[in-house]
Amino acid sequence: MKNAALLLILSVAAVAQNYKAEQTQDHGVSVVRLTDAASGVEVSLGPTMANSSDMKVHGKSILTNGIPFLAPWANRLGEMEFWANGKEYPFNPNLGNVRSPVPSHGLLMSSELWRITEVAADANSAHVTRKLEFWRYPDLMAQWPFAHEYEITHRLAGGVLEVKVTVTNVGADPMPISLGFHPCYRIPDVSRDEWGLHLPARTMVVTDDRLVATGEFKANSLPNPLPLKTHNLDTGFTDLERDADGKAHVWIESAGKKVEAIFGPKYAVALIFDPPAPAGQTRDMACIEPMAAITNALNLNHAGKYPNLQSVAPGATWTESFWIRAGGI
């Protein structure tokens, strides 16, 4: 009986020790490292919440450029202004925090304004939570005059990384939701010429010569899986096929290896970016970007061409997750 009790105690201790969350240093930079020893997965997150992220499976990276957060809007707008609640808001290029002449990637892609609020692990997962109080920063509010806060939790459980974002509207007006993320994936030890993209989407977003959405759509006629050797995309897709929980699954696969992005129901759009490699070089990456809306959604909604724009009411929150899962690596 004593031996059985001891084995039970050791078993529980082993489970509890499987997950680890720690703040440490990597080449002189402060990082948070999440570990799932049983699954062989390690996630590292740097202070900017952008390009300093990494996810390794059995020691091999499946990310090439971190998991940049694109907010308050994802990817491109058509003009140097946006519309919300029937009002036009021009950007001030002199502040230096908006790309021009095509505003892209929001205002926070490389921001160091995030504050860590929790780093913890238990028998079920390891996680880190960070917060950014947008309303505190005049240069941000000058470009996007909606008082709000972001909270992002990266949670590692069962070898799967969940990225959960919560937007809290602390202002007096409804705030449009057009955010997204820009993760770029890779299949270790396999050339992109051998990858297939599995994209269960019925509809493709039509764009102009600046890759800005026009408000038009067309049927997705691309093969599924799509051979990336012969296709380079910078394209949004919608009407995603979803499982019983409302989740959409998009993945790259080759040689028995798979890297999968899973979108929660409020991520209506998948933007696929797999640019051609420069002459004489390789570029083994494919971005599968979860987006709450198509590019230029703010202005297309005002023009009556995109009625599906989400918003968060004063005092309310908007929450959604996406997940990253790998197999065969």
Language-model regions, residue ranges each:
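A short, structured loop/turn motif at beta-sheet edges
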Residues: W83-E88, T117-V128, R155-V160, D189-D193, ...
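Extended, loop-rich substrate-binding clefts of extracytoplasmic carbohydrate-active enzymes
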Residues: N18-D26, N92-G158
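Hydrophobic h-region of N-terminal signal peptides that target proteins for export
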Residues: L8-A16
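Active-site pocket scaffolds in enzymes
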Residues: V259-I329
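Sec-dependent signal peptide recognition
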Residues: M1-L7
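Beta-strand-rich N-terminal accessory domains
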Residues: Q17-G96, A244-A268, P276, A316-G327
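Active-site/ligand-binding surface loops and adjacent short beta/alpha elements
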Residues: P174-P176, C184-K266
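Acidic, contiguous internal or C-terminal segments within carbohydrate-active enzymes
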Residues: L34-D36, V43-T48, L132-P188
